[in-house]
Amino acid sequence: EVLLPVLDMFHKKFPDIRIRINNSTTPAAMNALKSGSVDFSVVTSPVEYDDEFEIVNIKDFDDVPVCGKEMAFLKERIIGIGELKEYPLISLSKGSSTYDFYSKIFAENGLKYAPDTEVATADLILPLVKNNLGIGFLPKNLVESDLESGEIFKLNLKEKISSRQICIAENKNVSLGVAASELKNM
């Protein structure tokens, strides 16, 4: 929703410029930025960073807990975070900012976050949920069509989950090239 329209505009304006896109966790993206192997990173909060980085929030989003058809009976109830532990949970892997975010939420409720399935990237969570392998937290805007079609179901939590942000991160000590600067500013 954020990146693809910008890439489309950039490609139309600069059809001869090649783009390399990496898909990784926020900590891995920040390490790539620190090492200089990427010009800038689009990451999700929470973001831990050094003073050498500038982080700009570009869009807020809300995660929602979702399940597949075999657990659809849960959608009729209001359930607490603690009740989620009775069902298999799917999460990004330990060391990701998303894992840390949910670990903190569970800890605030006196619980240990222990997902049954951990995946390397967020795009793997939805297929696992659709195939009834557990409950996952996903950005609401990314699953709206799947919710409307009845492929997956949103669970109603007692607890409020804080909004998160999509951010652009860049190294203040490194000047962006013309192409990277144009892309970032779109």
Task: Please provide the spans of the model-predicted regions.
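Short beta-strand-to-loop elements that line the ligand-binding cleft
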Residues: 17-24, 44, 112-121
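N-terminal winged-helix
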Residues: 1-14, 18-23, 27-31, 175-178
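A ligand-binding cleft/hinge motif common to bilobed small-molecule-binding domains
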Residues: 44-51, 104, 122-152
